[in-house]
Amino acid sequence: MASYPNGQSCPGAAGQVPGVPPGGYYPGPPHGGGQYGSGLPPGGGYGAPAPGGPYGYPSAGGVPSGTPSGPYGGIPPGGPYGQLPPGGPYGTQPGHYGQGGVPPNVDPEAYSWFQSVDADHSGYISLKELKQALVNSNWSSFNDETCLMMINMFDKTKSGRIDVAGFSALWKFLQQWRNLFQQYDRDRSGSISSTELQQALSQMGYNLSPQFTQLLVSRYCARSAIPAMQLDCFIKVCTQLQVLTEAFREKDTAVQGNIRLSFEDFVTMTASRML
């Protein structure tokens, strides 16, 4: 028997937490535009979202109020993943992309970063290239699990790579999660402690025990005297929690807060939703 606390309400279709459709890419919120949706962390969950943007859209300017302007996740002011090379991506050489300009429905800044990250000029971002481009606040590379999860989410062609449209959606997705990470990093340490994660999940609408939160931190954090969660693990945990919550919601057709499953149904539901 699985359950969520009484009093928590299941969101309607407009607030549906995303799964991963057969196409293998992340659709974004249902009201997002474009082939890939908006690529932002979705609205809704089991419980109301916190005021001011978590699991929805941020306050004006794209950054939750009270967040610092300095780098989080190795993302300096003016753009993610370090500075662009002088003279634009690839210096002054024409490169793979020619002079065609930014493709339709692609964020111009994301397009510039796509060109910079696409080291082999193939027109796609591989797992290796993505991992090399992403760093946490302590300058460690994003872990393989999170990078592979994001490749699977935004790889519409199931080729193991992300095209420019998928990267544009991924870029927005990363920016939104970075903003949320900043908001919940109360002590501005550059990492999320067990207490901060508990507060974050609570404000996102999840009524989970401190013991469960501590389990998440111990599972996804590097061993240290004071375990804390870097941005890559924060993205992994919150995204996976959303996906599993949606799987639960689909089974809870009576909106009673509990479901009854056979062991095989449980394993199937979990395996089919793991990113």
Curated annotation (Swiss-Prot):
Protein function: Calcium-binding protein that acts as an adapter that bridges unrelated proteins or stabilizes weak protein-protein complexes in response to calcium. Together with PDCD6, acts as a calcium-dependent adapter for the BCR(KLHL12) complex, a complex involved in endoplasmic reticulum (ER)-Golgi transport by regulating the size of COPII coats.
Transmembrane segments annotated in the record for this chain: none
| Biased segments, Low complexity type | 59-70
Localization per record: Cytoplasm; Endoplasmic reticulum; Membrane; Cytoplasmic vesicle, COPII-coated vesicle membrane
- Matching InterPro entries, A to Z? EF-hand-dom_pair, EF_Hand_1_Ca_BS, EF_hand_dom, Peflin/Sorcin_CaBP
Q: Where is this region: Disordered?
A: 21-45, 59-103
Q: What protein am I looking at?
A: Peflin
Q: What is the lineage of its organism?
A: Eukaryota, Metazoa, Chordata, Craniata, Vertebrata
Q: What Pfam families does the database record attribute to this sequence?
A: EF-hand_6, EF-hand_7
Stretches with biased composition (Gly residues): 31-45
Q: Choose any GO biological process term that the UniProt entry carries and state it.
A: response to calcium ion
Alphabetically list the UniProt keywords.
Calcium, Cytoplasm, Cytoplasmic vesicle, Endoplasmic reticulum, Membrane, Metal-binding, Repeat, Ubl conjugation
